[in-house]
Design a protein with these regions (language model features):
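Initiator methionine at the very start of the polypeptide chain
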Residues: 1-2, 519
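Hydrophobic alpha-helical transmembrane segments of multi-pass integral membrane proteins
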Residues: 2-443
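Compact, charge-rich alpha-helical regulatory domains located at protein termini
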Residues: 442-518
Length: 519
């Protein structure tokens, strides 16, 4: 590596300008790219938990249940491990990653520490994976269950430190909007769920012969994760993403305090074990949330459909329809317990999964270095397969577990395979989206020699190799690049023609044009 004194004169002068706080045209793209990389890690680990420990294990469990024609046909420990991977491994990873990426931007302050963000990802991913492994028979589960619970709590603590204590010293305003209050309540619900999960883990490790949580603590953990964490945060993020991309009218902000307080009351009821009262309150909150978000009201603007499946707003409304159905089934399950499984599936797959399948392909590629969704057709196929599979699953599970229809046991496995196909298409679509290089959302002709060299290599790291091959040898000998050094100055430092470098870069960016621009 070169020292400052051995750098070309143009580089030394640019570093001197930087030290004197000379202005640099354009925002610094490097922090954005690094934050997107952290988000990509959360998304990829979430997709892995969705496809393998989550859905695949769930299909296996359902096949066992259908074969024995009883809900007790599959291992309860395996079912609990599957549920944990789905709720915390998939949805939890998505929510934590998106929160660490988007909330600092909303506040206008960068993430306090990217390193702590990566530590959060490592602790969370390891904790969820260890918990799943213990449930399916991993050796040493008596140590693994409590240890995994501690890792998950540590990850949550780190994430909240990063989110609620930003690096900016500017005075913070008290959050009053609907999205913020629901987010605060939702993370409170996650904390409650993880604390109960830790209690169950320690009790199971100390007293049980198998890695199976006591039924009451397991139900409390799941209900807290669902009603206290996933649903409030889904509503909170709907105020931003669903409203904008589906073209809805602005949310009714006057519902913020009541809905936030209602979620906290619901969490308190669940912690007290008052499940029937909690179900009644949950049904009321569902109605209030749908009213506040204006989900079923006519859109005020055209939906933003470019690059995605054009009917995705209909599936967002379908998701909220499933939410209402799930809340009704939860209430009914207090009188007919056999409906409990169908109710939970309507909420987790019907609402949560459908909402993510509908809005995720619209927002995640944009967050991940402004990529394009790989395929709108794969998005459409995953949504339709999920919709049909979920309908078949909820109907057949309610009928089969109630003992009302023998045919339902044959439909159950088929519904599972439909949902598995939907999940695999969704995972493949997002994975292929991530595998694509970020496109250049500008005309190559607009780039020239006066653009900072730092912008090129920070926004599109592969241009570093291109520029080195084109003769900018200093880039090969130093890692740091002065932010005010223009491409023309870098060319002069090497005795190169700046127009030749610009031509090479324009060829590079022509090959990176978005598909819709090339069509």
């Amino acid at each position: 590596m070169m020292t400052a004194g051995t750098l070309p004169a143009q580089w030394q002068a640019a570093f001197q300008r930087d030290r004197q706080s000379a202005p640099v045209s354009g925002a610094d793209p490097l922090p954005e790219r690094r934050a997107a990389r952290l988000l990509a890690a959360f998304i990829l680990s979430g997709l892995a938990y969705l496809a393998l420990p989550g859905t695949f294990l769930g299909v296996w469990n359902l096949i066992e249940i259908a074969a024995h024609r009883t809900a007790a046909g599959a291992s309860s420990a395996w079912i609990q491990a599957h549920g944990h991977a789905q709720v915390f491994g998939w949805v939890g990873s998505f929510i934590l990653g998106i929160s660490l990426f988007i909330l600092p931007k909303v506040r206008g302050a960068p993430l306090r520490s990217l390193w702590l963000g990566w530590l959060t990802w490592a602790l969370w991913t390891a904790g969820v994976g260890w918990r799943w492994g213990c449930g399916v028979g991993l050796h040493g589960w008596r140590v693994g269950l409590p240890a995994s619970a501690i890792l998950e709590l540590a990850a949550l603590g780190l994430s909240q430190f990063l989110l609620f204590f930003p690096s900016s010293r500017r005075p913070r305003r008290r959050p009053k909007d609907l999205g913020s209050l629901l987010g605060i309540a939702g993370f409170g619900g996650l904390a409650a769920a993880l604390i109960v999960n830790a209690m169950a883990a320690f009790r199971t490790a100390a007293a049980n012969a198998i890695p199976q949580y006591p039924a009451r603590l397991d139900r409390m953990t799941v209900e807290l994760a669902l009603w206290g964490f996933m649903l409030p945060l889904a509503w909170g993020y709907s105020t931003r993403f669903v409203t904008i991309f589906a073209g809805l009218r602005p949310p009714r902000q006057r519902a913020a305090t009541g809905l936030g307080a209602g979620v906290m009351a619901l969490i308190a009821l669940l912690l007290a074990g008052q499940f029937a009262l909690a179900d009644g309150l949950a049904a009321i909150l569902v109605g209030v949330a749908a009213w506040a978000l204006r989900i079923f009201e006519p859109s005020a603007k055209p939906a933003k459909r470019l690059g995605v499946y054009r009917h995705f707003p209909a599936f967002i409304r379908l998701a909220y329809g499933w939410l209402a159905a799930g809340a009704a089934l939860e209430l009914a399950a207090n009188f007919q317990p056999a409906l409990g499984g169908a109710a939970r599936h309507a909420l987790t797959v019907g609402f949560v999964a459908t909402l993510i399948f509908a809005i995720g392909p619209r927002i995640l590629p944009a967050f991940l270095s402004s990529r394009e969704l790989f395929s709108a057709r794969l998005m459409a196929a995953s949504l339709w397969l999920l919709a049909v599979g979920c309908l078949a699953r909820v109907a057949s599970e309610a009928a089969a577990y109630s003992g009302a229809a023998g045919w339902a046991w044959k439909v159950l496995p088929a519904s599972a395979f439909l949902e598995l196909a939907a999940v695999l298409l969704f995972v493949a679509n997002l994975a292929l989206t991530l595998a694509q290089p970020p496109p250049a959302w500008f005309r190559p002709e607009t780039m020239g020699g006066e653009t900072p060299l730092y912008w090129y290599i920070s926004s599109y790291p592969r241009t570093r190799r291109l520029l080195i091959a084109s003769g900018v040898k200093t880039l090969a000998r130093t890692r740091d690049v002065p932010r005010s050094l223009t491409l023309a100055e870098a060319a002069a430092a090497e005795g190169l023609d700046a127009d030749v470098l610009v031509g090479h870069l324009r060829t590079f960016f022509r090959q990176r044009q978005p598909r819709r621009a090339r069509a």
